């Protein structure tokens, strides 16, 4: 991806509120550049705290302007700790060289653990441990219906 690999792009900052898996973050790991992201939601499956900067925060009510069929009354969003964000941005800017190795580690971890082959291995393990046998087709044997004889009209 040209944007991710542009020489002026030094890291990815994602302040996602917890909308899902975080595929753009997973894709970005392959640039081997540092990542600053919220420490909440699906992306923490592949972003490791010792390899990325995961920001603290709290769960807060969603903004009333976004309520719809998906975001309903009582739904929560992750609100990042603004002070931690500011500190992390400054630290990344001042000490960028300290984060380069972590970005490379994160990229290698994602590449080794989040591939099609790894997914097949995990699904196979789950199926082998939980499915005793596959369903088999059996002949259908319905009882013969005894219908009343109807008179012609």
Task: Indicate residue ranges for each PLM-predicted region.
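Short alpha-helical donor nucleotide-sugar binding micro-motif in glycosyltransferases
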Residues: 1-7
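A short alpha->beta transition loop at the rim of the catalytic pocket in nucleotide-sugar-dependent
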Residues: 10, 32, 39
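Aromatic "clamp/platform" in nucleotide-sugar-dependent glycosyltransferases that forms part
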Residues: 17
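Active-site helix-initiating loop/hinge in glycosyltransferases
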Residues: 20-22, 115
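A short, glycine- and acidic-residue-rich donor-binding loop in the catalytic cores
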Residues: 22-27, 35, 42-47
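A charged, aromatic-enriched C-terminal amphipathic alpha-helix characteristic of glycosyltransferases
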Residues: 79-80, 84, 94-125
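C-terminal alpha-helical cap of glycosyltransferases
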Residues: 95, 116-152
